[in-house]
């Protein structure tokens, strides 16, 4: 069964909490204001914006005392052809020492900042273009479309367009609804560059393109795409002992988007469809004990699976095969309790059981006195 009410409750149980959302917004706003007012960097910083799973609404609730991870991009006007990656990043050390003493560390392509309530990942980038083209891009990066700290789920009308403004109520609804994504010619061919200390080179990155692709895919899937990503991430976390460490994060998200058809009608249907498509699409690759090459939505020459080993991909493929069998049975079941128990084999106790009026089994079924633990059968049981 589709059990959409139970899926809705499950999703509410695994989304970041309202407090966590406010924490990362506060952290992002505070950092933005501090950068804006830090005199040595005033002429360098163009804007800062949220990226990553937080911005794309594909993050799941951290377990235990783990803090949310928040990616913040700093867009600068630095000339990457005249400055080394190390020198570019070193410009920000006085800022970090002033506002985050003892709380920051240098990473390969970013700075990590550990606060009591959130983990910030500060990514320094530069606009590689020059002249009028650079000016147009700076306008985009200074626009509400980029600066918003709301996630895609919170701002469903969002478009990548410097003319977009947040929909704050019924008065602005008609105006925001008329704004569509800007033509690809205005943004797609213009990724940012970011410094890599370890390789001592500048590489291309296009977080806005990833955000825009996610927003469009979610609309085409009736709002189910970002929730399906969350569900698969939760399944992976619940079954981590039976799965390889990778893929996770964005590569996992990309694999889901690659397999999910447009027009998704429900969570249950979407899960079965994307797993079945994943298995059929990569069967030959799996049989060859290899892994796929998947182009990044923002920088076409980047393989999203570059750091994933063939061994891990094949192990993950086997995990999806086992999970798909359970998901098919859960969707096919016509008994609410049985269906829910099967979904719980994948997602654990965060997936609720239907209430007493949720449907009865034939043969004397009685409502359990407490939530049942999943039966341990098969790879993920």
Curated annotation (Swiss-Prot):
The gene is cdnD02. Changing residue 376 to A: CdnD-GFP fusion cleaved by Cap3. In bacteria expressing cap4-dncV-cap2-cap3, this protein is conjugated to a number of other proteins by Cap2, probably via this protein's C-terminal Ala residue. More conjugated DncV is found in the absence of Cap3. Changing residue 51 to A/S/T: Significantly decreased incorporation of GTP but not ATP, makes 3'3'3'-cAAA. Its cofactor is Mg(2+). Coiled coil: none annotated. The keyword Iron does not apply. Keywords: Antiviral defense, ATP-binding, GTP-binding, Isopeptide bond, Magnesium, Metal-binding, Nucleotide metabolism, Nucleotide-binding, Nucleotidyltransferase, Transferase. Mg(2+) C binds at residue 196. It comes from Enterobacter hormaechei subsp. hoffmannii (strain UCI 50). Its EC number is 2.7.7.-. Changing residue 379 to A: Reduced CdnD-GFP fusion cleavage by Cap3. Primed for activation by Cap2 which conjugates it to cellular proteins; activation is target protein-specific (green fluorescent protein does not activate the enzyme), but which protein(s) activate it is unclear. The record marks 51 as: Important for GTP discrimination. The keyword NAD does not apply. Mg(2+) 3 binds at residues 258, 260. Pfam families: SMODS (PF18144). This is Cyclic AMP-AMP-GMP synthase. Signal peptide: none annotated.
